[in-house]
Amino acid sequence: NPNALRGYSALVPTLSAGLPLTLLGQDTTSITDIQLENSKNVVGGMVSGARQAHEAGLMIGVGTDTGMTFVPQYATWRELELLVASAGFGPAEALRAVTAVNASILGVDAETGSLEVGKSADLLVLNANPLDDLRALEHPALVIAAGHPVWRPAPKRFADIDALLDEAYA
């Protein structure tokens, strides 16, 4: 797309949607040999494309396809880690992608995506610095959405899936 570098296009690589199929054993994923090879080809292209887009300066946002077996709805932080590990992002770039860039892609950056006077009061309060370890995002102390606080949010977690992903991404 010749307009991509001019701000008309954005990429949301969604690496967490495919990577588990290539990293977890077939005894866990229950995919066939053909599906595994196809997954490796697709995921290789996803990772390569994300890295190339990042190097070219394209607008890159963050998404997860959270309805998939190995993509829990509470684990967006893993997608940020994958962007850092696989696509050449720094932690600050990954955090900007999931906040300001996502808001810009969706056309709501005048209302949210950064902390500014007049914008919606949307923020996380964490117990550690995510620039040191993105996993600090896993257990926020406080979520404020449109000015409404939620202390120590506790989504239902899937310990078995979390353990598999911890091992796969180690």
Question: What residue ranges belong to the model's regions?
Answer:
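Extracytoplasmic/secreted cell-surface and envelope-processing proteins
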Residues: 1, 21, 70-73, 135
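Short amphipathic alpha-helical segments and helix-helix/interface helices
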Residues: 1-3, 50
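Active-site/binding-pocket entry motifs
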Residues: 17-21, 59, 130, 149-150
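C-terminal cap of metal-dependent C-N hydrolases
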Residues: 98-100, 120-162
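Active-site gating loops and adjacent loop-to-helix segments of metal-dependent hydrolytic enzymes
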Residues: 3-41
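His/Asp/Glu-enriched, well-ordered alpha-helical/loop segment
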Residues: 31-37, 42-129
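Long, low-complexity intrinsically disordered regions
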Residues: 169-170
